[in-house]
């Protein structure tokens, strides 16, 4: 598949005994989304990720949600990361770095991205309540960290996500997803001043 700026599209699929997931992402889209995971709150978060990243994002996931949401959420992070990595291609001409602060009522979240080819994840600052809160009867907010970590490792990016402050687990989760979306949008954006790979090593 070509990975020019006119065709920065990535697709990935993964099928296991726990889930069957397919993802398509267009980095140069307009924020159109088509999301179906069987988990309404997770659908809401992925819709926000696509919309605020200005990515055209399609996610189809069938998982053992009757047992737990964990497998579907984490495996979606894996497949989305793989699709994102494919869409990035050689990474020529991109800004490479991006970050964003996102408020949601009482909460403030920050995300920073380096499209480095060196996968790493750091998540910090979430209040203790996030460990045992369940949103909508199906989305345990402790899964946030697993999703972002698997996304980062499979996209081969460095991703840092911070909750600076906040009380409502819904607000914290949504602010984090939106911060990641905006940081990714900035990092993958084309920069006319960058004529090749944005690294002094000549490769990412």
UniProtKB/Swiss-Prot annotation:
<dbReference type="GO" id="GO:0000105">
    <property type="term" value="P:L-histidine biosynthetic process"/>
</dbReference>
<dbReference type="InterPro" id="IPR020568">
    <property type="entry name" value="Ribosomal_Su5_D2-typ_SF"/>
</dbReference>
<comment type="pathway">
    <text>Amino-acid biosynthesis; L-histidine biosynthesis; L-histidine from 5-phospho-alpha-D-ribose 1-diphosphate: step 6/9.</text>
</comment>
<protein>
    <recommendedName>
        <fullName>Imidazoleglycerol-phosphate dehydratase</fullName>
        <ecNumber>4.2.1.19</ecNumber>
    </recommendedName>
</protein>
<dbReference type="InterPro" id="IPR038494">
    <property type="entry name" value="IGPD_sf"/>
</dbReference>
<comment type="similarity">
    <text>Belongs to the imidazoleglycerol-phosphate dehydratase family.</text>
</comment>
<dbReference type="GO" id="GO:0004424">
    <property type="term" value="F:imidazoleglycerol-phosphate dehydratase activity"/>
</dbReference>
<keyword id="KW-0456">Lyase</keyword>
<dbReference type="Pfam" id="PF00475">
    <property type="entry name" value="IGPD"/>
</dbReference>
<keyword id="KW-0028">Amino-acid biosynthesis</keyword>
<dbReference type="GO" id="GO:0005737">
    <property type="term" value="C:cytoplasm"/>
</dbReference>
<dbReference type="InterPro" id="IPR020565">
    <property type="entry name" value="ImidazoleglycerP_deHydtase_CS"/>
</dbReference>
<dbReference type="InterPro" id="IPR000807">
    <property type="entry name" value="ImidazoleglycerolP_deHydtase"/>
</dbReference>
<keyword id="KW-0963">Cytoplasm</keyword>
<keyword id="KW-0368">Histidine biosynthesis</keyword>
């Amino acid at each position: 598949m070509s990975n020019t700026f006119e065709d920065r599209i990535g697709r990935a699929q993964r099928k296991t005994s726990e889930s069957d997931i397919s993802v398509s992402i267009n980095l140069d889209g307009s924020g159109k989304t088509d999301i179906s995971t069987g988990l309404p709150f997770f659908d809401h978060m992925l819709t926000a990720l696509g919309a605020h990243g200005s990515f055209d994002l399609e996610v189809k996931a069938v998982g053992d949600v009757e047992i737990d949401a964990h497998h579907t959420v984490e495996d979606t992070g894996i497949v989305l990361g793989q699709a994102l990595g494919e869409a990035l291609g050689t990474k020529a001409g991109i800004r490479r770095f991006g970050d964003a602060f996102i408020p949601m009522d009482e909460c403030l979240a920050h995300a920073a991205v380096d499209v480095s080819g060196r996968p790493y994840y750091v998540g910090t600052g979430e209040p203790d309540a996030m460990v045992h809160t369940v949103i909508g009867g199906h989305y345990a907010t402790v899964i946030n960290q697993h999703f972002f970590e698997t996304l980062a490792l499979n996209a081969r990016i460095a991703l840092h996500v911070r909750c600076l402050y906040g009380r409502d687990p819904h607000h914290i989760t949504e602010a984090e997803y939106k911060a990641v979306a905006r940081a990714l949008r900035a990092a993958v954006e084309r920069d006319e001043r960058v004529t090749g790979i944005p690294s002094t090593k000549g490769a990412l």
